Amino acid sequence: MLCCMRRTKQVEKNDDDQKIEQDGIKPEDKAHKAATKIQASFRGHITRKKLKGEKKDDVQAAEVEANKKDEGPVADGVEKKGEGTTTAEAAPATGSKPDEPGKAGETPSEEKKGEGDAATEQAAPQAPASSEEKAGSAETESATKASTDNSPSSEAEDAPAKEEPKQADVPAAVTAAAATTPAAEDAAAKATAQPPTETGESSQAEENIEAVDETKPKESARQDEGKEEEPEADREHA
């Protein structure tokens, strides 16, 4: 029995040894390799994340730099355009006209001198004109202020002047109304007292009556106006 047991154990060991020999790797080595693979994969994952973040930062920095580079040439182009326009405007102003075939060689210099003199003459009157405009504006402002300051006193002076003509008009209207009413009443009385004997007299009486009727509303209107103006004058006096 013991011999059989020993033989079987040896056979099992031999089988394991054969497997190990065939594979060439022990189980411990397999476990160690598996652990190293896991660690390597984890490290690789971390490094990939870092690389992605760095790449994003690099991409953003590259975009910013590209935008700056694009803006730089645009600004330079704008400045160059502005300088080109200024130089182009200055060139025709300062440049002399081409000489005509019939003129002498000294004409360009004379033209330049004439242009310089004209420019100085234009600049000289412009300065006094601007000073005169400033002085005129200051005078107008002072005049407006003085008028605004004096406006209350002028209104106070105008008020009595307005009251006096109103007071003068009221008695005149009253006297005119008093003068017209007796004449109208006399004409009406005469027209009624005389008998209508003839057609001419009757027509005259009718005309007188019509004249009286026309004058009555006018007189009443004048009296009403006089009555309205009297309390206004009293109020103004008060």
Curated annotation (Swiss-Prot):
Gene Ontology CC terms = cytoplasm; dendrite; filopodium membrane; growth cone membrane; perikaryon; postsynaptic density
Q: Which segments carry the region annotation Disordered?
A: 1-238
Q: Record keywords: Phosphoprotein included?
A: yes
One Pfam family it belongs to: IQ
Under the heading PROSITE patterns, the entry gives: IQ (PS50096), NEUROMODULIN_1 (PS00412), NEUROMODULIN_2 (PS00413)
Q: Name one GO biological process term.
A: axon choice point recognition
Which segments show compositional bias classed as Basic and acidic residues? 9-32, 54-83, 97-116, 213-225
**What are the GO MF terms of this UniProt record?**
calmodulin binding; lysophosphatidic acid binding; phosphatidylinositol phosphate binding; phosphatidylserine binding
Q: Can you give the residue ranges of the IQ domain?
A: 31-60
Composition bias, kind Low complexity: at what positions? 84-95, 119-130, 168-199
Membrane protein topology class: Peripheral membrane protein
Q: Which residues are recorded as modified (Phosphothreonine)?
A: 181
Q: Which residues carry this modification: Phosphoserine?
A: 41, 151, 153-154, 202-203
Q: Where is the composition biased (Polar residues)?
A: 139-150
Q: What are the lipidation residues for S-palmitoyl cysteine?
A: 3-4
The UniProt similarity line reads: Belongs to the neuromodulin family.
The molecule here is called Neuromodulin
- Native species of this protein? Pongo abelii
